């Protein structure tokens, strides 16, 4: 199903362990190459050998939700083991290093930006962008312009106050140079001396980290009718701070411009910023800050290919929820409110949809997405459960005294966004993935309770619809209880409780064990014969599994193939806390045919994993195997090709009068076990795509529109995707 290529919500990492001959790789998703560094360990039960590893990343346009190709690439990894030598090394004061200035950032960049791959590269943009948004949150900026330049640099310009340039009393440098070269120097530490009452920056490291990891950085500041400029390289100033008087017509100009070129010594993969990834973050910020207009421009050497977009959403979070629920059937209009309590601001927007069986809850703190939740999310959940139970009983909507709706029941079908702005946010780490302020939980809880109680008492029809939806979830949970208990009772890792078709591996260590989910008995037979039984298990599926996007929990647990997946993989029960150690295999590999049916089955499986146990993606357990499409035989030599480009490259090297044979593999069952092992299952020669969810909101939208019940939405998706199909690549 070619529509799988639309999975913009997934950041796909392609891993290839190669022998001596480099190849072009791709899959049905056909990404372009892009450098990305990684570490590599020897495959289980095999001796180490020199190898390459490729990581590829693929992201798509969020607005159209269509795939765009992202580049990525490889780095040679030494196989030398870093072991202690027999000679004891001395350990004295001579071995104690003192890193000064920005040296710690360059020494351990991952501590500050997460990684030196694509994610860390984009984090540099977010650091500068967040600074501009902090100016907007403070009420001093209304416009932010982001440009992805053709030379690989990025510039961010805002019309805020401009970074101060006067002499700093402590460092005896200009304030501009101070914030660019000194860690933990900034104006966002709170208190009466802070330059911001609310900000996403806390540690004073964002701008200096970007400077440290940039081959070159140019900064311009417009303040008080003056223009100040300075250039840096790898964290050090290479010019003095210059100053000139602005011409009369530009006297009122104010703001800051940062343009940086990421350092190739740090980002050893190809340095290429993805337009769609950055566009997604910008759209998010525009929803969160309705008074700001953010533009994004991607320059190209060909002017006709230059892209430009503006993002401005006056409706704020209410408009954000409407956008997320575009493909769903809402029960009511979006509910939204804003409260200010004890210096903190709480914004909440929420809406229930009749055709959704899970919730989407997004949390933000000072415009920073807290992907791991926090006290603001906890406050919303607790308040929703308590308030709706109270209102249901008060209104007599729930008549049975023994019924108590749980959080899962009341949140079924809910899309909720909560954004808090607090003077002193307590984030966990520099990456700010979770909010820890205990007082925020109480503020959010109280705000949600007051608003919902007042609104729903005035609108009993909406209350009745929400409670009805929750009661249906409650009844479905009761109907599924027996099946859930069956799953629990069979979850013990005994062969007698495992699916009959599962060909297990001999290893009982989940870290080295992997399972291939294959399509049908034919492919299952070849895979069982071709695998390495020591660490590779095979689970054949019978036809297409249930589309759980359109089914409730009771129907899901009754499905035999779903039960086999849950029991065979050790997934546990939906809704319970995910524990990776309970999995039977830490690599779950989807291996289907390279045709429409194979893509459909792959999509159904991804839907199941996302809805049933989303944490599998976060834990890095979900992979997609890529079998070859062609086998090229010339004489006694045979080569495998994974796409048309690979095929073209190989055949173009043959003489014009060469005689060779091309075999097209329609399915895995056509391959001999030895071929399947060599091309698709051998850890040293295979291609795997590792899937992780990079944007939960976008992922939810994609699954809803692609696999949901609304035909009109799916039809529109197909029409949009059709315009991007390369007709030359269709197998007709």
Curated annotation (Swiss-Prot):
Domain (Toprim) ranges: 513-620
Q: Does the keyword Ligase apply?
A: no
Q: Where is this site: Interaction with DNA?
A: 544, 547
Q: Which reaction does it catalyse?
A: ATP-dependent breakage, passage and rejoining of double-stranded DNA
What is an example of a GO molecular function annotated in this UniProt entry? Answer: DNA topoisomerase type II (double strand cut, ATP-hydrolyzing) activity
Q: Which residues form a coiled coil?
A: none
Residue numbers binding Mg(2+) 2: 593, 595
Alphabetized InterPro entries for the sequence = DNA_gyrase_B_C, GyrB, HATPase_C_sf, Ribosomal_Su5_D2-typ_SF, Ribsml_uS5_D2-typ_fold_subgr, Topo_IIA, Topo_IIA-like_dom_sf, Topo_IIA_B
- Please indicate which superkingdom the organism of origin belongs to: Eukaryota
**Residues given in the record as Mg(2+) 1 binding sites:** 519, 593
Localization terms from the record: Mitochondrion
Q: How does it assemble?
A: Made up of two chains. The A chain is responsible for DNA breakage and rejoining; the B chain catalyzes ATP hydrolysis.
Name-wise, this protein is: DNA gyrase subunit B, mitochondrial
Source organism per entry reads: Arabidopsis thaliana (Mouse-ear cress)
């Amino acid at each position: 199903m070619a529509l799988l290529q639309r999975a913009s919500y997934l950041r796909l990492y392609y891993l290839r362990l190669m022998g001596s001959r480099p190849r072009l790789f791709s899959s049905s998703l056909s990404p372009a190459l892009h450098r990305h560094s990684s570490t590599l360990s020897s495959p289980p039960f095999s001796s180490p050998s020199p190898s390459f590893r490729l990581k590829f990343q693929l992201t798509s346009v969020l607005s159209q939700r269509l795939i765009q190709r992202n580049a990525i690439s490889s780095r040679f990894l030494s196989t030398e083991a870093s072991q202690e030598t027999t000679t004891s090394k001395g350990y004295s004061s001579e071995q104690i290093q003192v890193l000064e200035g920005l040296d710690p950032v360059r020494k351990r960049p991952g501590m500050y930006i997460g990684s030196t791959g694509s994610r860390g590269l984009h984090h540099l943009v977010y650091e500068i962008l967040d600074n501009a948004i902090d100016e907007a949150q403070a009420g001093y900026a209304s416009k932010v312009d982001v440009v992805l330049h053709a030379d690989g640099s990025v510039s961010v310009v805002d019309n805020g106050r401009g970074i101060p340039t006067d002499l700093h009393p402590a460092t005896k440098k200009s304030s501009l140079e101070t914030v660019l070269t000194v860690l933990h120097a900034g104006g966002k530490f709170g208190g009466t001396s802070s330059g911001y009452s609310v900000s996403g920056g806390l540690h004073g490291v964002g701008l200096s980290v970007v400077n440290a990891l940039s081959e070159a950085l140019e900064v311009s500041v417009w303040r008080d009718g003056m223009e100040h400029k300075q250039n840096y390289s790898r964290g050090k100033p290479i010019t003095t701070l210059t100053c000139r008087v602005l011409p009369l017509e530009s006297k009122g100009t104010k703001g800051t411009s940062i343009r940086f070129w990421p350092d190739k010594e740090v980002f050893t993969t190809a340095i290429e910023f993805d337009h769609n990834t950055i566009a997604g973050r910008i759209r998010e910020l525009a929803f969160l800050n309705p008074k700001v207009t953010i533009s994004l421009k991607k320059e190209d050497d060909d002017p006709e290919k230059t892209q430009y977009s503006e993002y401005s959403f006056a409706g704020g979070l209410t408009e954000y929820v409407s956008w997320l629920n575009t493909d769903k059937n809402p029960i009511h209009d979006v509910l939204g409110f804003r409260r200010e309590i004890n210096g903190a601001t709480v914004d909440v927007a929420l809406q229930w949809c009749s055709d959704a069986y899970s919730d989407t809850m997004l949390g933000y703190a000072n415009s920073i997405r807290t992907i791991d939740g926090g006290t603001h999310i906890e406050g919303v959940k607790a308040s929703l459960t308590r308030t709706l139970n109270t209102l249901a009983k008060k209104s007599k909507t729930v008549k049975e005294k023994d019924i108590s709706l749980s959080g899962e029941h009341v949140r079924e079908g809910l899309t909720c966004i909560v954004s808090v702005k607090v003077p002193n946010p307590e984030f966990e780490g520099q990456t700010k993935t979770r909010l820890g302020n205990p007082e925020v939980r109480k503020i959010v809880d109280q705000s949600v309770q007051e608003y919902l109680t007042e609104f729903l008492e005035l609108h009993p029809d909406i209350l009745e619809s929400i409670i009805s939806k929750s009661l249906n979830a409650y009844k479905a949970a009761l109907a599924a209880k027996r099946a859930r208990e069956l799953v629990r009772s069979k979850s013990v890792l005994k062969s007698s409780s495992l699916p009959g078709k599962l060909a297990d591996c001999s290893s009982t260590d989940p870290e080295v064990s992997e399972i291939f989910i294959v399509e049908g008995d034919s492919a299952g037979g070849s895979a069982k014969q071709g695998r390495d039984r020591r660490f590779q298990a095979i689970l054949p599926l019978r036809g297409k599994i249930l589309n759980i996007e359109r089914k409730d929990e009771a129907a899901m647990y009754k499905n035999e193939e779903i039960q086999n997946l849950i029991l065979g993989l050790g997934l546990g029960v939906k809704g319970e806390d995910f524990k990776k150690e309970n999995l039977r295999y830490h690599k779950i590999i989807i291996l289907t045919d390279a045709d429409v049916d194979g893509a459909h089955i792959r999509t159904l499986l991804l839907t199941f994993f996302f809805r049933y146990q989303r944490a599998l993606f976060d834990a890095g357990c979900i992979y997609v195997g890529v079998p070859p499409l062609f086998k090229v035989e010339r004489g006694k030599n045979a080569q495998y090709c994974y796409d048309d480009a690979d095929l073209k490259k190989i055949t173009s090297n043959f003489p014009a009068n060469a005689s060779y044979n091309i075999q097209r593999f329609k399915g895995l069952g056509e391959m001999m076990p030895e071929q399947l092992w060599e091309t698709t299952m051998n850890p040293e020669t295979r291609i795997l795509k590792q899937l992780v969810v990079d944007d939960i909101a976008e992922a939810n939208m994609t699954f809803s529109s692609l696999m949901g019940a609304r035909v009109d939405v799916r039809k529109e998706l197909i029409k949009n995707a059709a315009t991007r199909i390369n007709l030359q690549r269709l197998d007709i």
